[in-house]
Amino acid sequence: MIEKEETMENKQDELKIMPRGAAPRSVRRGKNMIAVASGKGGVGKTWFSITLAHALSGYKQKTLLFDGDLGLANVDIQLGLMVKDDLGSVIAGSKTLNQVIHHCDKTRFDIIAGRSGSAGLASMPIGRLQILGEDLSLLASSYNKVILDMGAGVEKPVRILSSMAEKIIVLCTDEPTSLTDAYAFIKIMAMQYPKSDLNVVVNQANSIREGQRTYDTLLKACTNFLKINPPLLGIIRRDTRVRDAIRNQTPLINRFPTSEAAEDV
């Protein structure tokens, strides 16, 4: 639990966020685009993005998963894929987004892989990031759902691309650092992009009841300090079979379709 909610409020000084009146220009949100973000790394964001995309494809939703995790891209690794072209090729200007789409047979959805170890997105000017987001918005019209697996933290690329999604899912766990950083992400997005549709998913909960307590702690801080109430979309219970699936580079829904975590997603 968070001992002092004021520690969340003090994150403003560390983030050096823009004043409310200095928000970036209005953005064009891509219909059917869902950004998955978290203030802290290590909360299972990429696994959740993959599993969500897999679940949607199982309901005959044409789905694209975009790996936007900056220099720590690993969607293709978790899926056991070897891709020739990735987002790095798009940033370099040698390929278009359409040309780096790969179909994953084992999950029945498409992916745009990131490039691990590359600072490409992090170093892109704001204008090019916005163009990339607009290209993604156009691409989204060819799909029922596009999942954006964003990097941890509140860096510029994460904020800009997340703002272009129709819905933002903030993933957190019960760890105090995860809750504090999730609050920081919600705060900066709410201030810079007040029309953002922010939602919460609690991951790795020991039980549904504990997951609800985790959400209530975050909600209390958001209500008291930000005057907003991001809704809870769901709680995913802690499941040791998730680690097994990741180690075997096999989607959880394929390997353990009746597991608690798979059912919760």
Give the location of each predicted region.
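Walker A/P-loop phosphate-binding motif and the immediately C-terminal alpha-helix
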Residues: 29-69
